[in-house]
Amino acid sequence: SNLVRLNLPYPMKLSWEKQTIIRSILVHPCLKKQLENVLFSVKENYSADQIENLGLNLFGGTYNYRQMRGGSEWSRHSWAIAIDFDPERNQLKWGKQKALIDNPEYDKFRDAMRANGFISLGELYNYDWMHFEASYELLYGLKY
């Protein structure tokens, strides 16, 4: 495997099994530093209670070798170049009217994601607000 372990700056919970605490995740090496920057930014800009209430500690996954839901192309998760946050409250087909991550409380989080080379499918297409994936610039070392 070419994946690397990222030690989390704050504990996260599996979104589908909230009693399970995780302290590290597997990611593609090209995005480890930038995702680490994002998570440290979350820790610096939000209190522990805010992180919990906003679901920024609810890990929806990075590496999952599978095709995209309803499609034949491989998911970005197949290469561990994407991460999902709080899938229960930011569901795949929900638009910004329902998804929480579009709310102003998440501005610093979304800003940190963009500043570190991650793309929000919610911001691009108004669905799958939980999902943030590495930009081409980040993947190919053109920036960051």
Model-derived segments and spans:
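Active-site acidic/histidine clusters and adjacent loop/turn architecture
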Residues: 1-55
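Alpha-helical structural elements
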Residues: 5, 11, 41, 58-60, ...
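Generic intrinsically disordered, low-complexity segments enriched for polar/acidic and small residues
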Residues: 7, 13, 43, 60-62, ...
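Active-site-adjacent loop/helix surface patches within enzyme catalytic domains
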Residues: 39-81
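Catalytic cores and adjacent binding grooves of peptidoglycan-active enzymes
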Residues: 69-144
